[in-house]
């Protein structure tokens, strides 16, 4: 039980900070969608941030996971492994960044954003900083320095949010003479209205640059070195992980990269393809609540389960953790899907027509989270080639799904393709895992909760309640009822867990050897 508590504690710490930070960041969605009322204005942001995520996987080469694995096996070599992995990332990142900065005008024309060369360059610098700081962040997780990790992330989010508000609201209003006329000469010096949505990239870049100061202790002891035998060992382990990560990114980002190009012109009356991409990209952010739960769990789970690799009780622990992970994610799926009428107010009016994609995206993320849990079998057994195979299959499903469904269903086709890919990956991973690393998962429980939640969401969406004073209490009551049903079903487990928790809180008897 102590191991379970440790994982829960770390997940809570990473989770509260990650959720709070991302919610602060999500507060920018109404700022951005109201400031840029035409969805096409944010189309390039949606697409370029997808490329940033793609490049980050290529730059880091899966070395974060390799660092976890080798640091857990040989803790005494952690400083050397840290230097080796970070040195590799620095070399790759430096070369790629120079190329991107040089080719930025050509890339802007190729992406059909010819006037946004500076946006490309800022994006290149953003991904460079993210890549270089990824290994120091991994070091904090390996060394169980969650508070330092959290502090750096929170300060970064605060800076990015503040700079967005400063550029997009304050500078814009002062420049246009709405208030504080005495500051207009200063604002004219730093603010150019032609940049517009580009200030989102600039704010991100300036916030990320602060990481080098915030993580200065995590860089301690780093020496640039290229120990080729060690690097080869790290690379051979990490390369399949990188391909897995790349396929995962393709699964998550193909929709935003394909939508503008595969959507027939005029598919949505009165909207351009750029408008459709802007709508999809902003509505997609409402699935952030599920992604946050998954990300928070993974921050704690990766180093935790690697440290338990040789423990004979690891399969049973993984099964229990996965069961409760699914329960929490199901409650998030229900809570968000039933309250889209309220959550939709967070985005500008012209963006709300895409809210129908959110329940499917949430379900896709739920299955993706289950897959990440199941995937520990090939990481713990050093059979990462299976992870590559599974995610490549998922990527193919995503690519083909978007190519065929976008022309027929528009951005709803993107959501369906993502869900299909996540389900396929989860099923394949489970079947292979049962052969190579059996884990006693409670499959009946998982399918029951997901099916029941899906039926509830579908039924509630068929009931149109235009009055929010009736709709909101009704939806909250349905959510509460769902939580109560789960509590009744799991009452024995909850009662046992509560009893163990209370016992663990009692002080040890005087004279006890414990």
What would you call each of these model-derived segments?
Residues 9-21, 48, 60-105, 114, ...:
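Membrane-water interface segments that mark the loop-to-transmembrane alpha-helix transition
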Residues 1-7, 175-199, 210-252, 300, ...:
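Interhelical loop/hinge segments that connect adjacent transmembrane helices in multipass membrane
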Residues 461-514:
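Membrane-proximal transmembrane or re-entrant/amphipathic helices at the cytosolic face
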Residues 1-26, 79, 83, 228-244, ...:
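N-terminal membrane topogenesis motif
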Residues 121, 151-220, 244, 392-398, ...:
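Hydrophobic alpha-helical transmembrane segments
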Residues 10-25, 199-215, 219, 228-303, ...:
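Transmembrane helical elements of multi-pass membrane transporters/channels
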Residues 72-88, 279-391:
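Specific pore-lining/lateral-gate transmembrane helices of multi-pass inner-membrane transport
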Residues 3-64, 92-101, 126, 160-161, ...:
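Signature of the first transmembrane helix
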């Amino acid at each position: 039980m102590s191991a379970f508590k440790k994982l829960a504690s770390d997940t809570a710490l990473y989770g509260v900070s990650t959720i709070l930070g991302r919610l602060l960041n999500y507060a920018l969605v109404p700022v951005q969608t109201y400031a840029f009322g035409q969805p096409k204005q944010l189309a390039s942001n949606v697409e370029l941030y997808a490329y940033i995520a793609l490049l980050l996987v290529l730059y880091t080469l899966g070395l974060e996971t390799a660092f976890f694995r080798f640091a857990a096996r040989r803790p005494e070599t952690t400083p050397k492994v840290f230097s080796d992995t970070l040195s590799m990332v620095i070399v790759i990142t430096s070369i790629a960044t120079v190329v991107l900065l040089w080719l930025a005008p050509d890339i802007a024309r190729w992406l059909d954003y010819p006037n946004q060369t500076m946006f490309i360059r800022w994006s290149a610098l953003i991904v460079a900083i993210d890549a270089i700081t990824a290994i120091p962040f991994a070091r904090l997780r390996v060394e169980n320095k969650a508070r330092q990790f959290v502090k750096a992330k929170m300060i970064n989010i605060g800076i990015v949010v503040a700079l967005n508000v400063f550029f997009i609201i304050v500078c814009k209003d002062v420049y246009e003479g709405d208030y504080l006329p005495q500051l207009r000469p200063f604002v004219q010096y730093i603010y150019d209205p032609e940049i517009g949505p580009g200030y989102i990239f600039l704010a991100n870049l300036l916030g990320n640059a602060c990481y080098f100061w915030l993580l200065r202790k995590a860089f301690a002891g780093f020496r640039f070195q290229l120990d080729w035998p060690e690097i080869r060992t790290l690379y051979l382990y990490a390369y399949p992980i990188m391909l897995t990560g790349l396929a995962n990114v393709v699964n998550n980002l193909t929709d935003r990269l394909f939508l503008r190009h595969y959507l027939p012109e005029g598919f949505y009356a009165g909207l351009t393809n750029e408008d459709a991409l802007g709508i999809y990209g902003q509505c997609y952010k409402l699935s952030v609540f599920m992604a946050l739960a998954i990300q928070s769990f993974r921050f704690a789970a990766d180093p935790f389960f690697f440290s338990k690799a040789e423990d004979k009780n690891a399969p049973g622990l993984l099964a229990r953790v996965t069961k409760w992970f699914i329960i929490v994610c199901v409650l998030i799926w229900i809570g968000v899907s039933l309250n889209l009428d309220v959550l939709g107010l967070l985005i500008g009016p012209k963006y709300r027509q895409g809210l129908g994609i959110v329940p499917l995206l949430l379900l896709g993320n739920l299955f993706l989270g289950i897959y990440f849990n199941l995937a520990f079998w090939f990481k713990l057994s050093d059979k990462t080639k299976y992870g590559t195979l599974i995610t490549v299959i998922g990527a193919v499903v995503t690519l083909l799904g978007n190519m065929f469904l976008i022309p027929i269903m528009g951005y709803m086709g993107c959501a369906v393709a993502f869900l299909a890919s996540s389900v396929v990956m989860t099923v394949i991973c489970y079947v292979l895992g049962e052969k190579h690393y059996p884990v006693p998962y409670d499959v009946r429980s998982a399918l029951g909760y997901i099916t029941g939640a899906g039926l509830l969401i579908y039924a509630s969406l068929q009931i149109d309640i235009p009055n929010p004073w009736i709709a909101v209490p009704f939806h909250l009551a349905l959510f509460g009822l769902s939580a109560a049903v789960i509590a009744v079903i799991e009452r024995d487990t909850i009662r046992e867990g509560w009893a163990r928790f209370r016992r663990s809180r009692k002080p040890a008897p005087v004279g006890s050897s414990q």
